[in-house]
Amino acid sequence: MMKIIFMGTPDFSATVLKGLLDSGQYEVLAVVTQPDRAVGRKREIRMTPVKELALEYKLPVYQPEKLAKSSDLEELMNLEADGIVTAAFGQFLPSCLLDSVDFAVNVHASLLPKYRGGAPIHYALINGDEQAGVTIMEMVKEMDAGDMIASKATPIEETDNVGTLFEKLALIGRDLLLDVLPAYRAGQIIPQPQDPSQVTFSPNISPEEERIDWSKTNRQIFNQIRGMYPWPVAHTLLQGQRFKIYEADMMAGSGQPGQILSISKKELVVAAGKGALSLKTVQPAGKPKMAIVDFLNGLGRSLSLGDTFGK
């Protein structure tokens, strides 16, 4: 049975880890994940999804803030694992650790060499791509730059958002890894280098990128909103206060960008630079997330035609 160290953090990673564990082909000697963090409005300390799963399976868990500078590093190297599997871990692996195993592979949620970095799923949606995918690649010191072992694509649907696409790609990544890892270890797959001329990056979303620019087309804003749902969430200003928009639909319409074109007890339509958007799920400052109907029958009653978002 192949002995591996698994490294990952979010739900995407947990899906891959569970696939390895349930396959019965791998002995997971240790799981490495990010430290517990404070999350949500109440800043409650929560374990990562990978840690929760590892504890369920009674696996040793390591949570170094920086693996390269951690005392855990030597202990991991002494485990004498055959290989390392990573999936959305969020840290670089030290060369000494990579050199201590026979193989190290990463499950990355993009069709490399496109979208190296930490937010490939977000950018695939924000940029309006027609497809996304997963690549299994060899680990090297440079971020997501290793030779590609296998990849698989899937269409992006109009109804997809970050959450739904994460779920789809996690399952694809799990199955693809289980399909190709034995053949790769047997030398039956020759990894292919990435084309340097086709490399693009997907760094973590910045606060500036979360803000909606109403002068953009309704398609661009629609893609931004779904490319940040359920996190980090696109936002604008309304009456000087932050106003988050979780979901919206594209509509025909014209007016000054950000201007309210139509308002009723059930619908709120806002002009974009081209076309318009009907807001569906929102969150006013200091309030919980709510359906647009609830907003319009509460705080939204003070709004009227011609009021403008973004100010």
Curated annotation (Swiss-Prot):
UniProt-recorded Gene Ontology molecular function terms: methionyl-tRNA formyltransferase activity
Main enzyme class: transferase
SS bonds (residue pairs): none
Catalytic activity: L-methionyl-tRNA(fMet) + (6R)-10-formyltetrahydrofolate = N-formyl-L-methionyl-tRNA(fMet) + (6S)-5,6,7,8-tetrahydrofolate + H(+)
Keywords (A to Z) from UniProt: Protein biosynthesis, Transferase
Enzyme Commission identifier(s): 2.1.2.9
The UniProt record lists the keyword Transcription regulation: no
Domain of life assignment: Bacteria
One term under GO cellular component: cytosol
InterPro entries given in the database record: Fmt, Formyl_trans_C, Formyl_trans_C_sf, Formyl_transf_N, Formyl_transf_N_sf, Formyl_transferase-like_C_sf, GART_AS, Met-tRNA-FMT_C
SUPFAM superfamilies, per the entry: FMT C-terminal domain-like, Formyltransferase
Coiled-coil ranges (or none): none
Binding site for (6S)-5,6,7,8-tetrahydrofolate: S110, L111, L112, P113
Role summary: Attaches a formyl group to the free amino group of methionyl-tRNA(fMet). The formyl group appears to play a dual role in the initiator identity of N-formylmethionyl-tRNA by promoting its recognition by IF2 and preventing the misappropriation of this tRNA by the elongation apparatus.
Protein family (similarity comment): Belongs to the Fmt family.
Name of the protein in its database record: Methionyl-tRNA formyltransferase
Native organism: Streptococcus sanguinis (strain SK36)
Gene designation: fmt
